[in-house]
């Protein structure tokens, strides 16, 4: 692999002491691969390191962390307007790793790192909310948002993605649906939503396939709404993905407008955004990402 250009790894600070990762990087450096490593400490670090990556002339910026880290790095990359932006590499090190998992990124660190450096760079879409905040994987509202936002860090560290489900079951008595109106291309719905998923990617909340047919290079966003008054049946519908469930509404559009009479919160790759009006649009071919040849998210 000695002929591959240099890469810069932006590593979430929580993984800075990951010994297997240190060993994998050392082995690749011994093979002649140039890998710069930078560790994030606070919000804004990813943007600064992407700027540094441009100055260093690297061809790949690797996001080492969970969906939030991938979001920060990819958002910084699409801000580059002059010249060709570095490609995005994925190194899944978070609690759930929803985007990387659905994209088929290997779980083994050494294999994921090699793919992030040497994999084919494919153009993929991103999405933008209210002309400002971006997401690469999914925007979730309702039950899913409240659970992923409120699940304690210690529970996530101990149990991983299943912690979201456990915390959700514990909070059943306090969760109510959100009344809203959602419009898109040839789509209109109004009612009470228990769960809303608007996906560029397919899964969120620790492995739940909210938008199972989503693709990241088709110029569309997939929508799935779980309706109804009773939360427990909707939760089990989320887990079983019943195709004939009358409480599941699906749609696809390059954009969606959402209006609610009260404030609701969407979770954008782990980042909460609250309001009553949301305009969500796809950004076709917004960045290049190094993905496996059999990536299930590509058409």
UniProtKB/Swiss-Prot annotation:
NCBIfam families: lip_kinase_YegS, PRK13054.1, YegS/Rv2252/BmrU family lipid kinase. It comes from Salmonella paratyphi B (strain ATCC BAA-1250 / SPB7). Belongs to the diacylglycerol/lipid kinase family. YegS lipid kinase subfamily. Disulfide bonds: none annotated. One of its GO terms (cellular component) is plasma membrane. It is found in: Cytoplasm. The active site is at residue 271. Its EC number is 2.7.1.-. One of its GO terms (molecular function) is lipid kinase activity. This is Probable lipid kinase YegS. Its cofactor is Mg(2+); Ca(2+). Residues 2-133 form the DAGKc domain. It is an enzyme of class 2 (transferase). Keywords: ATP-binding, Cytoplasm, Kinase, Lipid biosynthesis, Lipid metabolism, Magnesium, Metal-binding, Nucleotide-binding, Phospholipid biosynthesis, Phospholipid metabolism, Transferase. GO terms for biological process: phospholipid biosynthetic process. Mg(2+) binds at residues 215, 218, 220. InterPro entries: ATP-NAD_kinase_N, Diacylglycerol/lipid_kinase, Diacylglycerol_kinase_cat_dom, Lip_kinase_YegS, Lipid_Phosphate_FormReg, NAD/diacylglycerol_kinase_sf, YegS/DAGK_C. Probably phosphorylates lipids; the in vivo substrate is unknown.
């Amino acid at each position: 692999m000695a002929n591959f250009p240099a890469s810069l790894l932006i590593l979430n600070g929580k993984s800075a002491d990951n010994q297997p990762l240190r060993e994998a990087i050392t082995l690749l450096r011994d093979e002649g691969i140039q890998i710069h490593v930078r560790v994030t400490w606070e919000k804004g670090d990813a943007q600064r390191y992407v700027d540094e990556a441009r100055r260093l002339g690297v061809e790949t910026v690797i996001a080492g962390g969970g969906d939030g880290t991938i979001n920060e790095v990819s958002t910084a990359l699409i801000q580059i307007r002059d010249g060709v932006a570095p490609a995005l590499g994925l190194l899944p090190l978070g609690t759930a790793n929803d985007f990387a998992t659905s994209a088929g990124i290997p779980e083994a660190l050494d294999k994921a790192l090699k793919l992030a450096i040497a994999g084919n760079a494919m153009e993929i879409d991103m999405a933008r909310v209210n002309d400002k905040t971006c997401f690469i994987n999914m925007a979730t509202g309702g039950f899913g948002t409240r659970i992923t936002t409120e699940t304690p860090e210690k529970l996530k560290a101990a149990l991983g993605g299943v912690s979201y489900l456990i915390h959700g079951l514990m909070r059943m008595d306090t969760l109510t649906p959100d009344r809203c109106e959602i419009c898109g291309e040839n789509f209109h719905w109004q009612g009470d939503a228990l769960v809303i998923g608007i996906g560029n990617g397919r899964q969120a909340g620790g492995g739940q396939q909210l938008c199972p047919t989503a693709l990241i290079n088709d110029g569309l966003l997939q929508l799935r709404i779980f309706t109804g008054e009773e939360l427990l049946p909707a939760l089990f519908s989320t887990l079983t993905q019943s195709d004939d469930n009358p409480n599941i509404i699906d749609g696809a559009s390059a954009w969606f407008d959402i209006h609610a009479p009260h404030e609701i919160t969407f979770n954008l790759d782990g980042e909460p955004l609250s309001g009553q009006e949301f305009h969500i649009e796809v950004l076709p071919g917004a960045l290049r990402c190094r993905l496996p040849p059999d990536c299930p998210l590509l058409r």
